[in-house]
């Protein structure tokens, strides 16, 4: 049985380009982001994988990445479930600010702490720990059972919601996970064992 799970961070968004804290705000993809999503589809096609089910967030940039990827891949009619549990970390009062504006208001050290600590949330927002607590129940209840039942599964989501999944899959600690960077539009291909641990992992660089 092929227990396939593929994770893809959405292509570059307009706010990624402007270096803004995005969180639950809903900007579209840039032209580069569109190209990245299509390139991810081509990379997966070249790798010879197929899909039975997809999961994405409640936000446009992840949904559009899924749609563009699947069109390029040749499975435009794949069943895809959208759920807010896979949304990006909520940056609260930082949302819509660029990194320099945030530093002016709260100081470099404080903003760095909010961005890179595991359990310190920005005002009105979520810490990475909060994001993990939101994402993992959905993974355990919906995504993982599909994978273990042999459904080849594609997830398009966000840097921090995918960090939550990778933390479990790669057995990373709260100390190591905040500093892990995820490139936009690059598929990470996991194959799982029957006990849900990782059998193999491959990053499909464009």
From Swiss-Prot:
Positions with a binding annotation for substrate: 9-16, 22-23, 61, 88-91, 99, 115-116, 159-160
Enzyme Commission number: 5.4.2.11
Entry keyword annotation includes Ribosomal protein: no
The organism's taxonomic lineage, starting at the top: Bacteria, Pseudomonadati, Pseudomonadota, Alphaproteobacteria, Hyphomicrobiales
Keywords: Gluconeogenesis, Glycolysis, Isomerase
Protein name, per record: 2,3-bisphosphoglycerate-dependent phosphoglycerate mutase
Classification via SUPFAM superfamilies: Phosphoglycerate mutase-like
Chain positions of site Transition state stabilizer: 158
Active-site feature positions: 10, 88
GO terms for MF: phosphoglycerate mutase activity
Pathway assigned to this chain's UniProt record: Carbohydrate degradation; glycolysis; pyruvate from D-glyceraldehyde 3-phosphate: step 3/5
Top EC class for this record: isomerase
Function: Catalyzes the interconversion of 2-phosphoglycerate and 3-phosphoglycerate.
GO biological process: gluconeogenesis; glycolytic process
Catalyses which reaction(s): (2R)-2-phosphoglycerate = (2R)-3-phosphoglycerate
Family the UniProt entry places it in: Belongs to the phosphoglycerate mutase family. BPG-dependent PGAM subfamily.
UniProt xrefs under Gene3D superfamilies: Phosphoglycerate mutase-like
Subunit structure: Homodimer.
Keyword Zinc-finger: no
């Amino acid at each position: 049985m092929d227990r396939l799970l593929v994770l893809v961070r959405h292509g570059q968004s307009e706010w990624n380009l402007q270096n803004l804290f995005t969180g639950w705000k809903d900007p579209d993809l840039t032209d580069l982001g569109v190209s990245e999503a299509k390139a991810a589809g081509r990379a997966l096609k070249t790798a010879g994988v197929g899909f039975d089910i997809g999961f994405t967030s409640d936000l446009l940039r992840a949904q559009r990445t899924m749609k563009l990827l699947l069109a390029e891949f040749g499975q435009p009619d794949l069943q895809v479930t959208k759920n807010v549990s896979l949304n990006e970390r909520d940056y609260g009062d930082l949302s819509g600010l660029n990194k320099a504006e945030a530093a002016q208001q709260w100081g470099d050290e404080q903003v760095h702490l909010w961005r890179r600590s595991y359990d310190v949330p920005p005002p009105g927002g979520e810490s990475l720990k909060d994001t993990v607590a939101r994402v993992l129940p959905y993974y355990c209840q919906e995504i993982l059972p599909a994978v273990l039942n042999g459904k080849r599964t594609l997830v398009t989501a966000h840097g921090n919601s995918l960090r939550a999944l990778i933390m479990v899959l790669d057995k990373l600690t709260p100390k190591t996970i905040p500093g892990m960077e995820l490139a936009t539009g690059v598929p990470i291909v996991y194959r799982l064992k029957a006990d849900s641990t990782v059998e193999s992992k491959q990053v499909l660089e464009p």
